[in-house]
Amino acid sequence: TLRTTKDGPRLYNVPVAETEQLFTSAKQGKELTAAQANELLDEFNDDVLRIKATLKLSHATSAGLNLHGQRLLDYDLNHTTINGTFYSPEELTSMEITADIYIDRTNAEVFIDGGAYSYSMGLKPEAGNTEGFHFWGNNIEVKNLEVFRAQSIWK
């Protein structure tokens, strides 16, 4: 979609609206530490999920979310990058980032800050890594965390 920002028109990538019908809410939390968010995610594995999270960094550092050791989100505030690619939020002084992550068995699609930036990646877990989902970063807050399960097409 094309949106007007303070810097002019900008193209945003968002999933089609019909994807909302495919997912049902499974768990949610607000104002969590990384450890609390990790505990909330413990019951979930790398099956078909949608995870929406807002991370607040305490200072200019990096933070993100791993799945079996693979970085689904690596936000480096010092170098203004996401997974090594330049990204600057609309509000330049913001210490927050929002990610809407769609995960199936082989792929993850990630939509940052409402679609201002998006990427797709293959899932390649580290051999022997069984940690599942894991938020990481120095003194981060997970302001909002929502987990959705996909409905089966076989029902």
Q: What function would you assign to each model-found segment?
A:
Residues 1-155:
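Beta-rich accessory regions
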